[in-house]
Amino acid sequence: MCTGGCAKCLGGTLIPLAVLGTLANILLFFPGGKVAEDSAHITDEVWYFGGILGSGVLMIFPALVFLGLQNNDCCGCCGNRSCGKRFAMFSSIIFAAVGVLGAGYCLILSAVALNKGPKCNTGEKWTYPFQDGNYLADHALWNLCKSPDNIVPWHLTLFSLLLVMSGIQGLLCGIQMVNGLFGTLCGDCKCCGCCGGDGTV
């Protein structure tokens, strides 16, 4: 597969992951699937917008760049056939690095949130009863949270989704960094029609 075609495939995969990451983060603002009575009852890590910012907004830019690489004009620099495509592939490395940073941000926040556990009402006060991640292996501890209903599985499911999706996004952006390097050094496997040639660009 050409480097431009590979980038387009990666970009097409990043878009739905970015949308899902954003939706997962939005759902976390509704603990247990219900509207929170007080914003202070929402887990702190939700307010850092890992899914909306890191896995969403910062991932849309690389995805759009990757999608446009295959259609980039290969005669972009003073009629030089190779310059346009190679520069576009080089710029994709920079956008891929932005994507890796966004995915890493979401990944770290999700891991911290999973280890810390949800903020819930223990009957006495709103607190974090699972500070050391022990609730992940011991479901009996979930009963420490009296409300909101089903807050532990809600928290666990959504942050796990964010963790997995951001990991995949980081991997895809890492692949594009390597792909972009090959495209910069070796060119794409074919020239677009404006150059009137079939050779490498």
Regions found by a protein language model. Give the residues of each.
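Extracellular/lumenal N-termini and interhelical loops of multi-pass eukaryotic membrane proteins
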Residues: L114-D149
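Signature of small four-pass
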Residues: C2-T122, L162-L185, K190
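Individual transmembrane alpha-helix segments
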Residues: N143-G167
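Intrinsically disordered, low-complexity segments enriched in polar/charged residues with Gly/Pro
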Residues: M1-C2, D44, G84-K85, Q131, ...
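Non-transmembrane, juxtamembrane loop and terminal tail segments
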Residues: C192-V201
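Extracellular/mature segments of secreted proteins
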Residues: T127-F130, V152-H155, V201
